[in-house]
């Protein structure tokens, strides 16, 4: 395992595996919940974050969470689009703009990230406290609060794609 995390390719494979596992386990956890719409998305998003938090703690590296900001919203937006009554063209306009943002950030992360030995210096600083404060900073400051910020930021896409009376024409965009 140590040799795997020393290379960029091995580290990327592990992070990808962790994301697939977290998304799938979050799906399994939430699939039988009797929640609708945004609340279901929120519970799924938080569940996936907590699973990534566990993987981050296994590696003692919170930078595993870094691409979560822009990778986790991708299945969320496609899930929302699947619920949409907008035309394919209107959905494509919204999804294209979103994907441009998400893929651009993911590509930039990919270019600049070295491997699982690299942890953002800000995370290290936030965790350079006593163990309890470090845990609180890691769980809330590095993982959960950013997830909630991203979740709130996705709400306009949710409203756009799920509103029945929304007139999404090129003039409005």
Task: Describe the predicted segments one by one.
Residues 1-17:
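N-terminal membrane topogenic signal
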Residues 12-29, 48-51, 150-156:
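Hydrophobic core of alpha-helical transmembrane segments in multi-pass integral membrane proteins
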Residues 22-23, 44-56, 72-79:
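Central hydrophobic cores of alpha-helical transmembrane segments in multi-pass inner-membrane proteins
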Residues 24-38, 55-61, 84:
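Short, hydrophobic transmembrane alpha-helix segments
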Residues 31, 159-168:
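Membrane-interface helix termini and inter-helical loops of multi-pass transporters
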Residues 33-48, 63-74:
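Loop-to-helix transition at the N-terminal end of transmembrane alpha-helices
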Residues 58, 62-163:
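Intramembrane catalytic core of multi-pass membrane enzymes that act on lipidic substrates
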Residues 171-173:
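Conserved small/polar residues in nucleotide/adenosyl-binding loops
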């Amino acid at each position: 395992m140590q040799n795997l995390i020393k290379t960029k390719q091995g580290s990327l494979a592990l992070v990808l595996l962790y994301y697939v596992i977290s998304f799938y386990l979050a799906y399994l956890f939430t699939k039988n919940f009797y929640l609708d719409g945004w609340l279901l998305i929120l519970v799924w998003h938080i569940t996936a974050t907590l699973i990534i938090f566990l993987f981050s703690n296994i590696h003692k590296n919170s930078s595993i969470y870094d691409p979560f900001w822009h990778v986790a919203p991708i299945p969320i937006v496609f899930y929302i689009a699947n619920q949409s009554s907008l035309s394919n063209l209107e959905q494509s306009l919204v999804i294209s703009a979103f994907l441009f943002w998400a893929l651009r950030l993911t590509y930039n992360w990919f270019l600049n990230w070295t491997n699982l030995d690299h942890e953002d210096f800000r995370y290290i600083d936030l965790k350079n406290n006593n163990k309890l404060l470090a845990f609180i900073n890691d769980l809330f400051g590095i993982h959960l609060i950013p997830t909630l910020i991203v979740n709130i930021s996705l709400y306009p896409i949710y409203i756009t794609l799920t509103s029945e009376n929304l007139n999404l024409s090129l003039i409005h965009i």
